[in-house]
Amino acid sequence: MEKSSSNFIQNGKRDHGGKLRQYNYKLEEAEYRYFTEERLFYRRRNPVEKIAQRIPKPQIEGTFTWSDELRCNYDGNTQFLPVEALEGCLPLEKLNQHLKPGFRLEVVVRPSLDPSITTKSPEIRWFGEVTAVCGFYVAIKFVGELNRRPCWFHMLSEDIFDIGSGLKQDPAMKWLQYRPLSLLKPMQCPKFWRRGSTPAPPVPRPTEEILDEFQAELHENRISEPKIFDQLRHLAHRPSRFRLNQRVELLNYLEPTEIRVARILRILGRRLMVMVTAQDYPEDLPSVEAKDRQVQHENVEFWVDESSFFLFPVGFAMINGLRTKATEGYLEHSRRIAEGSGSYHKDDVTFEQLFAGKPDISAEKLNLLKVGQKFELLDPLSDLRQSFCVATIRKICKTPGFLIISPDETESDDESFPIHIDNHFMHPVGYAEKFGIKLDRLAGTEPGKFKWEGYLKEKQAEKIPDEMLRPLPSKERRHMFEFGRVLEAVGQNETYWISPASVEEVHGRTVLIEFQGWDSEFSELYDMDSHDLLPAGWCEFFNFKLRHPVLPVNDPNAENGEYD
């Protein structure tokens, strides 16, 4: 018996040569395709309103793109750090379970892929299979396109959907069509995809075979959960818990014993642009010449993650006896907050708002922390973070979990600053030696002669209990940080600056990141949990400029990059 024809071609008959020889389509204006996990069939439904054309955001002028690196990924020359290695970069859970090689998707076909499409055309979609995942980018091979290389899409773009989503949006198929890329002209498209009075030519045999295989695999758990991409985009775009123009207390990075009042002026996901403005400053703002990156001036931006150690809620400084530079009105307001006799202003960032999500630490455990305890510190205020230093707890704050700490390099309190015990910078005694990180020597100590045991005995001090500091990430996650894997990294001093970068070394939970185009002397240490490490594609999603790698002046490609 003749093998039944493809389920993608309804009511057609096939001769022994495999060609369609007659069609018995019943044409109705409102008939449409409905996709289940097993087959396609028609149902009647009233037409729906036109689906709005999804137009990509205009690309920022001068921004770097990952196109060359993505092409190199096919040849195995470039490997990307996976999204799941960077926990918390976006509020997306188990993303890798929904986007991995072999998954089937529904993809919007844009004019760059099909020149026959215009802004007045119906939205064209076709089916594809994920072949690779690189950061926030996925490579998708279109069904039936044997001679076309996979195309790259941003996994959070408006170009990829779960199977069947188009039919739910436009059941009558009036403003949306499904069409293979190889069939550019309308009359080349099989009648199954474009109904008309003229019979369509047969689908080429290779394409038909792939469509059969594609359909057969739909019930093999190779399709994403319904509406998963809409849910992921919703999570990525969900409103921040902060609002524009809210005021927050900000650690002065030039004088870390001082707190200033700042305003939230921009919000991109977890990243906030916070600036000290004239309305909250008790005197004239420091001039541009002062090179204070936190003060509002033209072309000056200070960006931090919403969990940054720079940020504190209104009233924090007053409660903990920290020096505050602010107007008399603010000082009086925060004093009432600290005393419990006043209420927050609607623009105040409160303790509950800023510290939402911070782990609760029991009083019993907090009692293990003592003034004078020592530890190893990746100094977040250092100009270049390439080593650890010896540091000490100077004070226990009234706000539970907060400490005043400082490096032992100076006996002065001028370098001390407040920080929560749950942070990325404090490490247990012996961490640097165990994982091969340079520990800055103290004054009077010969190179390579520093020993923790002798130092603690000399200072009559004890080390901070290891259980008070963050544990190592899982071995599985640490192994994701392989040498050479690329990502986007925020400059830890120039916080408005995000650059393409790669993993250079791994030391326990600490990674040395090299900025593309920069010498290794500018590489910096980051914690694996740092929110300053971002997957490739973060800047594109949030429409933030990704800096070009620095190129030598004599480099022929220097006109496309930035000069050293």
UniProtKB/Swiss-Prot annotation:
Entry keyword annotation includes Repeat: yes
GO cellular component terms, semicolon-separated: nucleus
Superkingdom of source: Eukaryota
Organism name: Caenorhabditis elegans
MBT repeat residues: 64-176, 205-327, 331-442, 450-549
Subunit structure: Interacts with histone H3 that is trimethylated at 'Lys-9' (H3K9me3).
Changes seen on gene knockout: No visible phenotype.
Repeat listed as a keyword: yes
Gene transcribed to yield this protein: mbtr-1
GO molecular function: chromatin binding; histone binding
Annotated protein name in UniProt: Malignant brain tumor repeat protein 1
An annotated GO BP: negative regulation of DNA-templated transcription
Key words, A-Z: Repeat
